[in-house]
Design a protein with these regions (language model features):
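Amphipathic, oligomerization/interface secondary-structure segments
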Residues: 1-87
């Protein structure tokens, strides 16, 4: 499970595509946290409703032209995933 989560972290680090970056963070965090994902994300300052809206938007619009979570929120999720993998 940890190796799979690390692969998602690597995808995030090597991508400039918003949709791919967000989904890689979501997938890595979901592997490690399951249903606790949103609670832990909120502890890092990422609003659960905004997170869910961002995921919904990506599913509805593969173009990914609109950014719902800003770079600061993506970095918070990245930090959460990184810390879980180094703990």
């Amino acid at each position: 499970m940890m190796d799979n989560a690390r692969q998602f972290l690597t995808i995030y680090e090597n991508s400039s595509n918003y949709s791919e970056r967000l989904l890689s963070l979501y997938n890595g965090l979901f592997l490690l946290l399951g249903e606790r994902l949103y609670d832990e994300a909120e502890k890092c300052g990422v609003d659960k409703a905004s997170f869910l809206d961002a995921l919904k938007y990506i599913r509805e619009d593969e173009e990914g032209g609109k950014t719902i979570l800003d770079e600061e929120n993506l970095e918070a999720l990245y930090s959460l995933l990184s810390s879980l993998l180094t703990a």
